[in-house]
Amino acid sequence: MNLNSIPAFDDNYIWVLNDEAGRCLIVDPGDAEPVLNAIAANNWQPEAIFLTHHHHDHVGGVKELVKKFPQIVVYGPQETQDKGTTQVVKDSETAFVLGHEFSVIATPGHTLGHICYFSKPYLFCGDTLFSGGCGRLFEGTPSQMYQSIKKLSALPDDTLVCCAHEYTLSNMKFALSILPHDLSINDYYRKVKELRAKNQITLPVILKNERQINVFLRTEDIDLINVINEETLLQQPEERFAWLRSKKDRF
């Protein structure tokens, strides 16, 4: 299996998995044009589309792709049923694509119906988990998002986190504002800054490393707890997550 990223809009990534036979899976095609160009350039045969949630920058290209390749099966949560989804999937169900079984994980928060797809080592997490951050809460609550990213953080160490946006640099600037002396965060920030200066992608990331540099995954970390306690005493990891999300919204 080969993992490919296709840039779209200002900072989106459309992920494509292809096998040796050229069959491919497309994840969150917000725009059809760059996907069609990549399909033509690589001689891929699209087999399926995965949708994580209903936002236009993730579903906008579905209808054009299905029109061009009517054999495509479009998997998605209930909230994408009017966006071209032909196979609605929900938590704990599986999608069998390219000879691999993908587990569906419900991750409400960014939207109420948001889902992720996992087949070792690939995690397609849409706008739930970003490198160094997590998605904004357009529909869900901090409690829901905390539980969602906790699920994702429990996946195997070698999981490849395939986020849908290039937000890593801004996320790491926020992380530094919270834990300015953290060695892992500082090292990763420098690496990301160099990559972005060359207009290079920072994704995917390895989950084991992400747990070290993503403050939203470190709500039980004593260094973070001490920082938060300087401002307010919060007893539960869930409360500390909500504090971080509120700070990030205003950053």
From Swiss-Prot:
- Kindly list the positions annotated as binding Zn(2+) 1: 53, 55, 110, 127
Q: Which cofactor does it need?
A: Zn(2+)
Protein name (Swiss-Prot/TrEMBL):
Hydroxyacylglutathione hydrolase
> PANTHER family recorded for this chain?
HYDROXYACYLGLUTATHIONE HYDROLASE, HYDROXYACYLGLUTATHIONE HYDROLASE GLOB
| Highest taxon in the source lineage | Bacteria
The terms under GO molecular function for this entry are: hydroxyacylglutathione hydrolase activity; metal ion binding
Q: What is its EC number?
A: 3.1.2.6
UniProt subunit comment: Monomer.
> What role is this protein assigned?
Thiolesterase that catalyzes the hydrolysis of S-D-lactoyl-glutathione to form glutathione and D-lactic acid.
Which SUPFAM superfamilies has this protein been placed in?
A: Metallo-hydrolase/oxidoreductase
Q: Which Pfam families does this one have?
A: HAGH_C, Lactamase_B
Recorded source organism is Escherichia coli O6:H1 (strain CFT073 / ATCC 700928 / UPEC)
Q: Quote the pathway field.
A: Secondary metabolite metabolism; methylglyoxal degradation; (R)-lactate from methylglyoxal: step 2/2
Q: How is the cofactor bound?
A: Binds 2 Zn(2+) ions per subunit.
Q: Which GO terms describe its biological process?
A: methylglyoxal catabolic process to D-lactate via S-lactoyl-glutathione
Residues annotated for Zn(2+) 2 binding in this entry: 57-58, 127, 165
UniProt feature coiled coil, ranges: none
Is the keyword Metal-binding assigned to this protein?
yes
